[in-house]
Every structure is written in C-alpha cells, then in structure tokens.
C-alpha cells in the first residue's frame, strides 16, 4: 500500500494534483482512497489531500506517515513522510533554499512555481510539474494516453508537457534547463534520480 500527502494552500492545485492522480490510479486498476482536509472559507487557507492506493482493498485510509509528502506550502504542521518534496524555500525558516548538505538524501527541493512560470508561462503549470515528479517517485509509469485521459480539458496539452517535464527532472539536461529558467537550484533525491519514466 502506498500513501501520499499533498499539502498546500487553497489555489495551489492540491485538489487538481490529487484528483488527477487518483483518477489515473483507478483507471490503472488500483483501489484508491482520497480524503481532503481544507478550509473552504478562505482562498489561501490550508488544503491537504490524503491519497492511499493499493491493488488490494484498503481497510484504513488514515495516514500516520506517508511514503511521499508533496509540500507546496508551510500551512500544515506535523506531517511525516519517508520522502518529502518541498517547493523551494519551504524547508528553511527564512524562505531561502537550504544548503545541499542540510537536505536529507531522501528529500527534494524543487522550484515548482518558478518552473511553471518560466517554462510554461503560468505558475499553475508548476503543479503539473509537481505531479510528474510525484509520479516518478511513486513509480507510476502509465502510457501518455492514460495520463491525457484524466487531465482537465482546459490546457490539456500544456498540462501534459508540464507533467513530462516533471517526470524527466532527473535527467541532467532537463534539471539544468530547469535551474537556468527558474534561477533556483533543484535538489533531487538519489531515489528519484534512479527512476525511469515512460
């Protein structure tokens, strides 16, 4: 059983990322549980998605420790995961990138917002880059046609290209392009560098 938490603020794509991934997993034959915890009154309020999936029936969808935590904001406290993927600046108190030696080898720091803006023209595509990276770390490698089938109709082509970009971040040329375009360093885990995407 795999457990993923997506953490952010309202308007950061938490629901789109998690729902797209959940629909994809269902189409791939997995049992899926997706639970949301969010403040519906305020844009910018806490937004969490708890996603559990397995080939067998899911008895308990509660997540104490996730396999992967995608952290797009610092709003949520006390979340634990084996691997955490931070939006750049969230792992430090001053909002700047952490020193490479201060980031555990299982964790990653990626400037999703800047990549979305600089490479695809809108910050919202950074969330699809995050989805692509999440798919690699979770070892979800469906054919492109399966991914396209669950993408929102609006900006389908741009979203697909952003997901592919996220899936290929472990490739040196792709990583370098991302760093040049965003002006920020990208730190990937060894685990993520070894994954191959389709």
Predicted segment positions?
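Active-site cofactor/cluster-binding pocket
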Residues: 1-198
